[in-house]
C-alpha cells in the first residue's frame, strides 16, 4: 500500500511538472531558444557556428472574429520552405493556422505573410527526421501525441 502511494505521488508530481512546463513556461512565457547574436544567419552559418540554439519564428494568426493569436515556435528551413511542428500537448495554434489559411511570421525582425499547408507522407518524414524529438525532450513534454507539421509558403 505504501509503495502504491509513492507511485501515485510520483505520477501526480510528474503531471504537475508537465502542466507547469507546457502551460506556464512554454505557453505563457513563450521563450525564444535562439541566441540573439545568431539572428540573421543563414542555415549554413548556423550549422557552421554550432551554438546558435533553436531557430524560432513568431507566428501571428488572425481568427475569423478578428482576434490575433501570437505564439513563438521552433522553425526549420528546408527545401525553400519554413516548417513548424506541433509536438506539444497544446496545439491550438496549429488548428487556428489551418483554419485561417494564411499567417504572419516574424523571423529575425522581418515580418512576412505565409500560406499554411499541412505536411504529410514523405515530406512529413523528411522534416520529422530533421527535427528529432529526443527522449529527454519528450519526457519534459509529457510524451505528447504524434506531432503535426505545417509548411509555411511565403506569399508575394
Regions found by a protein language model. Give the residues of each.
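Short beta-strand segments
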Residues: 52-88, 103, 114-115
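N-terminal Lys/Arg-rich, disordered targeting/topogenic segments
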Residues: 1-2
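Short, conserved active-site entrance elements at the starts or edges of catalytic domains
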Residues: 22-68
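Short, structured beta-strand-loop surface elements
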Residues: 89-156
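Hydrophobic membrane-insertion alpha-helices, especially the h-region
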Residues: 5-23
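Residue-level signal for well-ordered alpha-helical segments
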Residues: 6, 10, 36, 52, ...
Amino acid at each position: 500500500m505504501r509503495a502504491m502511494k509513492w507511485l501515485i505521488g510520483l505520477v501526480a508530481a510528474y503531471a504537475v511538472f508537465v502542466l507547469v512546463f507546457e502551460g506556464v513556461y512554454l505557453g505563457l512565457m513563450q521563450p525564444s531558444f535562439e541566441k540573439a547574436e545568431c539572428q540573421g544567419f543563414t542555415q549554413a552559418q548556423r550549422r557552421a557556428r554550432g551554438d546558435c540554439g533553436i531557430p524560432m519564428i513568431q507566428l501571428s494568426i488572425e481568427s475569423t472574429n478578428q482576434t490575433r493569436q501570437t505564439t513563438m515556435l521552433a522553425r526549420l528551413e528546408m527545401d525553400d520552405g519554413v516548417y513548424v511542428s506541433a509536438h506539444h500537448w497544446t496545439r491550438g495554434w496549429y488548428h487556428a493556422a489551418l483554419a485561417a489559411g494564411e499567417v504572419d511570421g516574424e523571423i529575425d525582425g522581418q515580418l512576412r505573410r505565409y500560406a499554411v499547408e499541412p505536411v504529410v507522407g514523405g515530406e512529413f518524414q523528411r522534416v520529422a527526421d530533421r527535427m528529432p524529438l529526443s527522449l529527454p525532450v519528450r519526457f519534459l513534454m509529457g510524451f505528447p501525441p504524434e506531432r503535426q507539421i505545417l509548411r509555411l509558403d511565403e506569399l508575394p
